Amino acid sequence: MENGHMNGVRTHHDRNSWTNGVNGGVAKREGSPDKGKAHANMSGSSVMMNGGGASFMDVDSQPPGGTKFNDLPDEIQHITADIMPLSLLLTRLSQWTHTKLQDEIAYLASKPLPQGVLNGTTNHQSADNHDTSQESLEKKVHLLNFLQDMHSKWVKTLVITEWSRKAAQVGALIDIRVHLLTKQAHYQELFWELIRMKQDLHWAKVPGPDLKTALEVLTTGQASWMPELGYIEPPPITWEEKEAFIDNINTMLSVRLTFDEHEKLPAAFRDYNIANGRVTFKVKGEFEVDLTIGDEDFEQQFWFIDFRFLFTPAPAELSHGVRTFLENKVNTILGDQGLAGCYNYLHEFVLTQKIIEFRRQATELAMGRWVDTLKVEKLNRAMSIQYWLKPPHGLEGPSSQTAKSWILLGVWSGKGVEGDLDSKPSSYISLRWFRDNKEVKDFDIPLNVETISAEKLLTAVIASHVEYILRSISSKLLSKPRFAQKHARLDLEISKEEPQNSSLAVQLFDNDKAVIKIEPLTGFFTMFPRSPVFLKGQMKLNTSSNVAEEGANLMEQLRFDHAVKDLNSRVRSIGWFVCRPPITQEETKTIVYSDASGSREAFKAVWLRKANWMTRQWFVMISMSLGGDQWWLVDLSPPKPNFPAGRLRLFTKMPMTSNQLTLSDTFFRNLSVYAAGMISHITDLRKLHTLKKSHTALELPNHSLPPQVRLPTIYVRLSEMLQQRPGSSSRTLTWAKDFVPIIFKGVRSHTGDQEGPADATAVRRDTPASIRAEARLTVIDRNKFKSLRGNVDHDVVYNHRTGQFSLKLRADMGTPVVDLLADRVQALERLMEFVEAIRLAGSNAIPQSVALREVVFTYSNDPAEPVVGPPQGPRAWNVHLDLPKDAKVVLTLEKGNPHIRALDMLQDMAQSTKTELLPSYLPFSLPLYRVLDRIEDEWESIAAKNAGNVAIVVKAAEWVTVRFTLPAPTTRRLLCLDIKTMGRKGRLLWHVKRTDEKGHERPLNAPQDEFDTLLQRSVWHAHGDGRKTFGTSAAADPKVGIETLLWSISESVKSLVGTLPPPPGTSPHPGGGTQDLQQGPQKTPQEMVAAQAAQAAQAAQAAQGMPPQRPKQQPPTPSQPQQQHRNVNQPQAQAQPQLHTQVQLQQAQVAQLQAQRQAQARANNSSNNNNTFVNRAHPGQPPQQRQSGPQTQAQQQQQRYQIQQQAQAMQRMQQQQQQQAAQQHAQQQGQGPQGQRSVHGQAGPQGVPQGQPGHGGGANGGMGGKNAPVVVID
């Protein structure tokens, strides 16, 4: 009967069992209706014992001390197994019925409705109005079957319920029957036990001895009581008969095995041999069996002859007892099962013998060399060998289970789990390996069952276990970036035969490696080389709970311990030392895990610092992990009182890999250089970033550093590094390229030891180190620096071949080098300004010594032609310029130098923006100052006699004042001369003119004195010797003319020494003495100016290549007498010169105003070309550049053409103004006749007749009064 099911839902029905049911439990219910069969004394609370008449449903519980069922004896055991309470049956059945009913309702609801119902056309033709559609009929049939099935089940339950009223009696009957069956079984077992005992005693039965027969047989050789049967012995068999008989048997065996037994022959028996009347079946690696036949009938069985083992070690022959047993057994099987049964039996027999041999050898090993390391256990046709009884890496402890490893060797039946035949046709010996309490499904351990060796098998298993452990550690390490990226070597050697030869070598540093081996007998780890660090790591491996998983981390810990130990012992001699972590672990993680490309493996940090680093906040940190070793350069802020440890300020990763960790002196010297270079690099970049300077970094070859050290080169803009010079709007150097590389050159201690190459001397720990760097400035034009020698300074070298300046920079550790670069470049720029100025000076200035802090050169005037006049002094003078780093330039002149009187002015010029003009100015002004010295020396004797003196005042570089003073009784006899520069026709000349006592220009109407007459006679009209005269002034060439000019003035003034001044109304006679002012015609100052202008115009025409024109006058006509001509010249000539003088004064004022404005504009643009001489007196002329060499003919022609064009334009403008002024004057006087205009001359192409007094118009205008040229050097 089915018990139903709960459908997975737990109910709260009563689960208590009846007394006669499960667990001896009881259940309670109301009494069932009495059908006349119940006892009168039964109630709902009656207790049912064994054999009681009440039903299980009427039993509540058994009261304590109640009687047993029917008072059965104690020998009868009460049966309670496999009995369930009736309530459980009813509950389960009701639940199952309810579930089935729900399923049935759902099923009927899922059935399709009748077609008529769907269409709305129900069939109403039936008399009983029942639905007779096919769908309804199927539902009804299905429901009827379900109800019939349920009805049958509940009827059966009803029958069981009725029988439950007699449950006590039935239970007692069951107990009695079981008791009787048990006794019957005892009797049968005893019977068979007696039979077996009788059979066993048969071998112990000894028959009684027949001594009489024995005595007769032993003495006579026969027994008289034995009857003679009279058998006739057959004739002996000959050899031919034997061979024929054997051949016959061989033939029958061959025929039988070929035709009759071919299909029945097992596959293992395919290898057989027929000879000597027997067939020998050979199963490789197992056995050989000899069989024969006893009858020609193929239906008869084979017979056993002999058996031999084919595996070793095995007995050569079977014992008599075993042979007899085997023969009987095999013959029986051959008779029943044939050859297949024979093979199966012998195959199983051999497998069992092999297992026995394995067990025997293992037992001997456990009692011999492998004592206390093996445990052999005998099983049914199987055995187990447990090795490494006390594994060092197992789980130890009261609550943990020791990891065990063993092999299980047994006979496998060859059947699958479900009983199907496996791929192997027969059973075989299988090997199962359990490693650390887990079975290994896939392994490659050779099992040799032909040559049995338990030791080799065990060695192979242990070798595989050792391989598993070492390979697990190796695989774990290889999965980490440090070994996956070949940053460290990992050598795994595996030996399948000798586990002690298997090893794992892990590289620690360079040649240092740790070799791990496992002792095959005990399983203990051994580590080489033998040292305290390795012994500690070996102990950790032996106590690990899971070496395969934790071995990689343990090896990394070992590497860190070894590294710290070696660093402490090696780096101290090189100046490094290991220090404590200056920051917390969390800050260290911030550094290590900042690399996005790195892994987040657990790491150990080693902090190093150089002893001779002046700064105490730079560290080198090594983060060692399986993710790879990383080297970091860390900068910490100074410690604070509340936070003693330094705070993290900057860190950068050093591009070094683990294979560079050689822990040698060479490596740490290179590390010192590299770290110092990085510190210098970072410090410079930080400084440049703070100053907001443009910069970049490129990695270029640096042969000053070891090949292993590669540092980037910083490029900066030279224009940004230079400070703004006073008075200059540009910071760009014109002589050097703008980009300057700063190349790191190594580290040098203050004692001079270099920490660069590997063979450098070791630096003392207490010796401060400094950074060495080099900045290279590439010049644009190498020809400008031919005068420089190799060593410009002790730390500045110029290479003529490459055209580069090498600036050696040295700074303390942590100090920016760019600050020194700016200072050196400024000093070098100042030097180059002097060198360029000396070069532009040409042959007049020759450099003698050029250094960064000192420049010495010689200068001279180098006249083009010999000077006639005063005696010449030395032609070359030395100038010494001291260029200190932070102080002003100091200019030193040798004794006797004519420029000593202008030393202060020269000193100021060297400090100003006109420094580059100094080398050109000195030879330019040397003749001037030389003649001034001569003049001053010449007048010393005169001054000593109080006959006169001379005073020379240097007001500016282009302005010198000379005052000649002669004694006079009433008035001062004073001649003041201004000597200034002027530009003319592209040349710079010295212009000498007379001024008043206060230095102002003399008015045009000033009375003429003795000095004017003297200068007009002997100076202002003298030509040649490099002089140009302008009537009231003169200009002289700076090389050959200025000395002659000034000397002639000095000699002329000396001629007045000792003479008396002329009386009033007289003027000095040209030949000496005085002349009356009333005698003869006297020229007014205006007439003199006009005459000078005419002379200047003639000079301009001569310069332009035009022939001089004589004054044009109309010849006198008869109608015009001579007196009229004189009258015209007398009264009207007085107005005409005055008018023309006013026009010239206006022109001079306009020209001077324009010259001042243009000079001011050019002064503002003077920074564009500091070597330009600006002519402020002639604004129409362009600024003239100093020529570095002689001009070509084309350049001279072009320059001459420009000057002519400018002169003609100036002349035309002046003539037009003069013509307009003359017409206006004529209109005012009312003179219209042609004859009067002819007095002035005919108007020609030049506008005004040349040569007329007061109408001269040169190309350069007048040179007197306010229109006198003023030339300055800018």
Swiss-Prot record:
The keyword Transcription regulation applies. Residues 1075-1085 have a biased composition (Polar residues). One of its GO terms (biological process) is regulation of transcription by RNA polymerase II. Residues 27-37 have a biased composition (Basic and acidic residues). One of its GO terms (cellular component) is mediator complex. GO terms for molecular function: transcription coregulator activity. Residues 1090-1104, 1120-1142, 1155-1172, 1183-1252 have a biased composition (Low complexity). It is found in: Nucleus. It comes from the Eukaryota. Residues 1253-1265 have a biased composition (Gly residues). Residues 1-40, 1056-1142, 1155-1274 are annotated as: Disordered. InterPro entries: Med14_N (IPR055122), Mediator_Med14 (IPR013947). Residues 1108-1119 have a biased composition (Pro residues). Component of the Mediator complex, a coactivator involved in the regulated transcription of nearly all RNA polymerase II-dependent genes. Mediator functions as a bridge to convey information from gene-specific regulatory proteins to the basal RNA polymerase II transcription machinery. Mediator is recruited to promoters by direct interactions with regulatory proteins and serves as a scaffold for the assembly of a functional preinitiation complex with RNA polymerase II and the general transcription factors. Component of the Mediator complex. This is Mediator of RNA polymerase II transcription subunit 14. It comes from Neurospora crassa (strain ATCC 24698 / 74-OR23-1A / CBS 708.71 / DSM 1257 / FGSC 987). The lineage of its organism: Eukaryota, Fungi, Dikarya, Ascomycota, Pezizomycotina.
